[in-house]
């Protein structure tokens, strides 16, 4: 079977979508399918890190070459407009990927099935191309973009337009993969017909990442790391406020943001002049692992109200490296962190986050330990299990 993945982000980029779709490609190839990936050219900082760690190896990993009977993954990258942080974000950037994508999907060998992922404009391009070629497609619904836009305070007309595009993409899909029950519920409300829930998983390496990442602080105190997307609906600026409040009790501490996103400039403005806060542009997934592995604790957040069903994948990535998490937000992620002693869960409150930083830095917080955290991810959020389940959904689109 020939499967085409249409995605603006793919491994070795350090995004949840890139890691999720890389795992799906490996699972499909391991089952004997041929996978063709239409994606974007890497951001310069990610490409540099990938060259240093060996991008050829990263792509070999993505090929899923597991021996006899394995398929092949072919990754085709095309130029795309990125913002100043290196992200493909905003509708000008989206169009720079989606319009050429339509032509790419209409050319070449006819696939048996196409897999699309957000944003909705990509889903629209996929639906149009698949209708013309009479090919079924699967929509991998990791989030509801219109809900995130509403939470970010985007004007109502824009939110309604995005919701219309999202509904169009979902209604045309033969099957939809949702990463949580909450996402599945909203997908059905927007018109999805056949939805399967496959929770996100992450790979737990045999050993935690080693080596010192470029730019890692040489300080005597704790280092808190926020690695991943920076956006208004995630409210990452609250960690700057909390760090500033707890600074005197943390000694020679550092707070480091490693990533990109629509909220990057605003975060930089908020952090300007705050001692001990650094911002590092997006790095490769391997380099992000090294940042998380060496951190005292990693940080994740979610603004409550309308998007509470989201589960930040950066939590799982941190635990896979044996590092505790401070999660400020609602939902299942908070329950997991609290009930399984995976760090500290609190509300999106400056004082509570400040206390969590002090508790983890001093060893006062309940913590299952490095081995315990990694074991929890293996048992509950294995990427091997999730990618196999997602691959089964993709194959079922032909049934």
Residue ranges and their predicted role:
Residues 215-247, 256:
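Conserved donor-binding/catalytic core segment of Leloir-type glycosyltransferases
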Residues 234, 284-291, 296-319, 326-336:
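Nucleotide-sugar-dependent
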């Amino acid at each position: 079977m020939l499967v085409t993945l249409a995605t603006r982000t793919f491994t070795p980029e350090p995004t949840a979508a890139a890691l999720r779709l890389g795992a799906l490609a490996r699972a499909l190839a391991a089952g004997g399918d041929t996978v063709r990936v239409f994606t974007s050219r890497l951001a310069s900082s990610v490409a540099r890190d990938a060259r240093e760690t060996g991008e050829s190896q990263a792509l070999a990993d993505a090929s899923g070459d597991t021996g006899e009977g394995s398929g092949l993954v072919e990754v085709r990258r095309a130029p795309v407009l990125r913002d100043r942080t290196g992200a493909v974000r905003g509708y000008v950037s989206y169009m720079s990927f989606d319009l050429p994508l339509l032509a790419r999907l209409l050319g070449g060998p006819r696939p048996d099935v196409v897999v699309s992922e957000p944003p909705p404009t990509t889903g629209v391009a996929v639906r149009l191309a698949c209708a013309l070629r009479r090919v079924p497609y699967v929509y991998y619904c990791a989030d509801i973009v219109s809900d995130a836009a509403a939470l970010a305070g985007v004007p109502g007309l824009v939110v309604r337009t995005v919701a219309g595009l999202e509904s169009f993409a979902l209604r045309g899909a033969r099957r939809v993969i949702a990463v949580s029950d909450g996402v599945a519920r909203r997908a059905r409300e927007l018109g999805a017909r056949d939805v399967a829930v496959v929770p996100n998983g992450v790979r737990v390496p045999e050993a935690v990442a080693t080596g010192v990442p470029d730019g890692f602080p040489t300080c005597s105190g704790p280092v808190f790391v926020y690695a991943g997307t920076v956006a208004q609906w995630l409210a990452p600026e609250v960690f700057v406020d909390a760090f500033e409040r707890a600074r005197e009790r943390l000694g020679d501490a550092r707070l480091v943001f490693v990533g990109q996103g629509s909220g990057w400039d605003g975060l930089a403005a908020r952090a300007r002049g705050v001692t001990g806060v650094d911002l590092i542009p997006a790095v490769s997934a391997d380099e992000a692992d090294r940042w998380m592995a060496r951190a005292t604790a990693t940080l994740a957040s979610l603004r409550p109200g309308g998007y509470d069903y989201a589960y930040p994948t950066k939590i799982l990535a941190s635990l896979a490296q044996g590092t505790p998490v401070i999660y400020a937000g609602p939902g299942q992620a908070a329950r997991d962190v609290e009930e399984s002693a995976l760090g500290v869960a609190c509300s999106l409150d400056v004082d509570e986050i400040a206390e969590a930083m002090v508790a983890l830095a001093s060893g006062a917080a309940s913590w299952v330990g490095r081995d315990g955290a990694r074991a929890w991810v293996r048992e509950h959020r294995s990427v091997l299990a999730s990618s196999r389940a997602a691959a089964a959904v993709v194959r079922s689109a032909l049934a």
